[in-house]
Amino acid sequence: MTDRTEAVKAYLLDLQDRICAALEAEDGQALFREDAWQRPAGGGGRTRVIENGALIEKGGVNFSHVFGDSLPPSASAHRPELAGRGFQALGVSLVIHPENPYVPTSHANVRFFSAEKEGEEPVWWFGGGFDLTPYYANEEDCRYWHQVAFDACAPFGAEVYPRFKAWCDRYFHLKHRGEPRGIGGLFFDDLNEWDFDTCFAFMRAIGDAYIQAYLPIVQRRKLTPFGEREREFQAFRRGRYVEFNLVFDRGTLFGLQSGGRTESILMSLPPMVRWGYDWKPEPGSEEARLTEYFLTDRDWLSGA
């Protein structure tokens, strides 16, 4: 393992520790259970899962470092010149599903790839981002989430936030439904256009911004009263989350195709989901407003 890979690994392990500690403190009841695992083909990871807490119904914060002799199809399909190279893949990926429907689901991921071939320089890139999936959305929360994203990107250039915000809107889109998964955030992949140190610094900025973006929203909404109606709508909308993760998500596809650990890969799925045939919310309801107003690709910072 190169010095660069060692530095990335050390950061990711520390990031996992810090995020888990912050979420445990906010929940105040449940603790993460750690499951260290090994991948027979090379590598392993630390899966941490929290369930049935005062705040978090189910959540997972996963670190993985896997390696192998050839990249799986999901990683080389859009870069055929890398086919046949060995690889190192490191990342932290997390999804938090709160019980209260007024607290959004959040997702974050930061990762590093290095495609290697003897006698040649490694081809490396970073990826990651974070995005928010509300059920009963609030404009204040949407603006705040995107403001933290904007601030994290600002030191790296004025064009970075709008570019990666738009990429997030495109990526987290359910093509078969014609709607976004949530209100977006940031998404980037194949990042190697800057030098290594700058790209690594950007990945750290995004990883470090997640707790700053999410916890204030949690704190504002976690005591909002809710009932059976809100829980049923939350379960219905969680179905969209499942559809995206199993059909479109590149991380899920890479993990399954590379022989990753299935329990860790699928830890992002919510615990309770429902599908209703051709179900539609009542016109003018808060449930209808989610799709009519919030689930659109809009500039949340304009006029903010």
From Swiss-Prot:
Catalytic activity: coproporphyrinogen III + O2 + 2 H(+) = protoporphyrinogen IX + 2 CO2 + 2 H2O
Enzyme Commission (EC) number: 1.3.3.3
Chief subcellular location: cytoplasm
GO cellular component terms, A-Z: cytoplasm
Cofactor: a divalent metal cation
The keyword Oxidoreductase is assigned to this record: yes
GO molecular function: coproporphyrinogen oxidase activity; metal ion binding; protein homodimerization activity
Keywords noted in UniProt: Cytoplasm, Heme biosynthesis, Metal-binding, Oxidoreductase, Porphyrin biosynthesis
Subcellular location(s) per record: Cytoplasm
Segments of this protein annotated with the region Important for dimerization: 241-276
Site location (Important for dimerization): 176
EC category name: oxidoreductase
Listed InterPro entries: Coprogen_oxidase_aer, Coprogen_oxidase_aer_sf, Coprogen_oxidase_CS
Domain of life: Bacteria
UniProt binding sites for a divalent metal cation: 97, 107, 146, 176
Residues reported in the UniProt entry to bind substrate: 93, 109-111, 259-261
Function field: Involved in the heme biosynthesis. Catalyzes the aerobic oxidative decarboxylation of propionate groups of rings A and B of coproporphyrinogen-III to yield the vinyl groups in protoporphyrinogen-IX.
Database matches in HAMAP family: Coprogen_oxidas
Subunit structure of this chain's protein: Homodimer.
PANTHER family, per database record: COPROPORPHYRINOGEN III OXIDASE, MITOCHONDRIAL, OXYGEN-DEPENDENT COPROPORPHYRINOGEN-III OXIDASE, MITOCHONDRIAL
Family from the record: Belongs to the aerobic coproporphyrinogen-III oxidase family.
Protein known as: Oxygen-dependent coproporphyrinogen-III oxidase
Taxonomic lineage from the root: Bacteria, Pseudomonadati, Pseudomonadota, Gammaproteobacteria, Pseudomonadales
Recorded name of the encoding gene: hemF
